[in-house]
């Protein structure tokens, strides 16, 4: 059983041949670690979150950038509005948006994950829709928002003082 107050996160690079190739695996482990909060799944038992470089998939493309803030121009305007919203409410709305997308737009599961009443989750999603103009029925728009959240998380991990 795991301590629920202790969060363990790790990134792992690929297995390499010879000590000479360890720096490459270490670099991959760091890149995987950047995505542990974004693409890694939290185990049901609260155990450690581990992101393997081999499992990054499309996120490997984003690793190629030396400065993730270069990606800001690709973040949807509505999501930028949400990130520019006043701080206390902004954090709740972003957390709700992430949970909503992670749960495939299922409000019941979103409410459960956030330990809030169903109507609270509905209210927050409606507020996000009104504030950002995001159309959750448009798959392309939802994908753009999901990628935008990844970009913001990368920047946050890259430079803790950015947001």
How should these model regions be labeled?
Residues 1-163:
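Cytosolic nucleotide-utilizing catalytic cores of signal-transduction proteins
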């Amino acid at each position: 059983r795991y301590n629920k107050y202790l969060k363990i996160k790790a990134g792992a690079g690929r297995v390499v041949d010879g000590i000479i190739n360890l720096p490459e695996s270490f670099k991959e482990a760091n890149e995987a670690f950047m995505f542990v909060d974004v693409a890694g799944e939290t185990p049901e038992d609260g155990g450690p979150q581990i992101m393997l470089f081999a499992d990054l998939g499309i996120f490997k493309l984003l690793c190629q950038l030396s400065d993730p803030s270069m990606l800001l121009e690709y973040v949807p305007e509505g999501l930028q509005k949400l990130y520019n919203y006043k701080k206390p409410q902004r954090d709740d709305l972003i957390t709700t948006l992430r949970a909503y997308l992670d749960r495939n737009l299922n409000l019941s599961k979103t409410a459960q994950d956030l330990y809030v009443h169903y109507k609270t989750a509905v209210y927050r999603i409606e507020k996000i829709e009104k504030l950002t103009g995001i159309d959750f029925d448009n798959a392309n728009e939802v994908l753009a928002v999901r990628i935008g959240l990844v970009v913001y998380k990368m920047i946050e991990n890259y430079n803790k003082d950015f947001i």
